[in-house]
């Protein structure tokens, strides 16, 4: 079972993944140190943001986290790969429905047209898999590495689907509440609403994966 400390750790990582840390249009990557602190302080420019004290602890150069990669695609998919400088953990976090530029795309194209109609966010899943493939092929990212996966809301749906696509690799799991995944053609639910926390050894969501 996850400890309170572990739950807080993954919740903080999920919240940090909501921040806009990679801005290729202006050549800015706020992946570590003061830049990362500023990025997670801004968060998603709405309610998901860190206090100064929280941000400094999260990005502490000796015990905290850095960002190895963040992507955002035209389907609204966004993922962030984190690395802990003390424990050497890697965590892959999928962002929830975005409230700014991707709001209409996430809610209409993904949530209404794909999830409600077909059970899967197909466009974002395709982008998730393509991005994961590049990470898994790179030893500096996820190649040969054990890592954890988190997701919230739409990101929870993606984390669930990520696990379903590689059931044999999952050892344990946790995530925050997410959208339901698809139903069987016969009407039975394949994966229902995500529970508040998927506990260790619960294979309904991923924790430790090794590509």
Feature names for model-found ranges:
Residues 1-47:
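N-terminal low-complexity, Ser/Thr- and acidic-residue-enriched intrinsically disordered segments
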Residues 150-155, 159:
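Gly/Ala-rich beta-loop-alpha elbow adjacent to hydrolase catalytic centers
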């Amino acid at each position: 079972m996850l400890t309170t400390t572990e739950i807080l750790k993954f919740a903080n990582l999920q919240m940090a993944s909501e921040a806009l840390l990679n801005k290729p249009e202006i050549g800015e990557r706020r992946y570590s140190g003061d830049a990362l602190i500023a990025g997670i302080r801004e968060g998603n420019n709405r309610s998901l943001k860190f206090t100064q004290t929280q941000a400094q602890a999260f990005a502490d150069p000796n015990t905290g986290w850095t960002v190895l990669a963040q992507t955002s695609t035209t389907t609204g998919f966004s993922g962030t790969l984190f690395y802990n400088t003390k424990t050497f953990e890697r965590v892959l976090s999928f962002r929830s429905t975005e409230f700014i530029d991707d709001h209409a795309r996430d809610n209409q194209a993904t949530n209404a047209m794909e999830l409600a109609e077909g059970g899967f966010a197909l466009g974002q899943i395709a982008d998730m898999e393509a991005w994961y493939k590049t990470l898994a092929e790179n030893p500096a990212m996820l190649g040969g590495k054990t890592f954890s996966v988190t997701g919230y809301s739409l990101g929870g749906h993606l984390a669930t689907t990520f696990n379903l696509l590689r059931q044999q690799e999952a050892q344990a799991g946790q995530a925050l509440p997410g959208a339901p995944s698809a139903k069987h053609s016969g009407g039975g639910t394949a994966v229902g609403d995500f529970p508040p926390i998927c506990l260790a050894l619960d294979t309904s969501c991923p924790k430790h994966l090794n590509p």
